[in-house]
Amino acid sequence: MNLIYVGDAMCSWCYGFVQPLDALLADPREAAPLQLALVMGGLRPFTTEPITPTRADELVGYWHRVAEASGQPFTAAPKTALHSPGFVYDTEPAARATVTVRSLWPQHVWRYFKTVQHAFYAAGRNVTEPEVLADVAEQLGLPRSEFGKAFASQEMRDLTLRDFEQSQSWGVRGFPTLIAEEGDHLHLVGSGFMALPALRERLALWTSAHDHAH
């Protein structure tokens, strides 16, 4: 099965979805052989206004719900990146960094995406900063200078925009969204956080319906 995952590295429910998706990738069962393609949806790209302390506190409250549902670790206020002075919640750089790794080192893209999420949510690092995104690349053994040069290129900016436009053209309204790809046909598997049993159930339903259609 070919699965398209539309998400964002700075989307808390996408971060919450890491463990169910990792478990599925490790043991795809009926979905085997499973291929996962990452598309960056664009949560808040090109934001320029710094986040207010009130809004930062609201988002941290929202993160508590994700933590409860998923068991994922989160930094507590006021040690989050959100609470750093002048933080701007621009999701384009992290998306572009992921697209850069997908383009140059595709076998590492899922690990990179997850590690950026962990850096932001669990370690409180500001992943809107190119140096932090390069740190993550280096952490995974990728060449920092090659990453940095590609990340800053117009080509990667354009490819990232293309991802955002692709997501919009599919009518994706929220993240994470999983889409099954069969030839030229796309089928929505699910949108929003799903625990592993629900995720397997959705895939089994789709696989069953697909088998009956053939």
Feature locations, PLM:
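C-terminal cap of thioredoxin/glutaredoxin-like
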Residues: V6-M10, G16-E30, L34, T115-H214
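Structural alpha/beta surface segment adjacent to cysteine/selenocysteine redox centers
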Residues: V18-F120
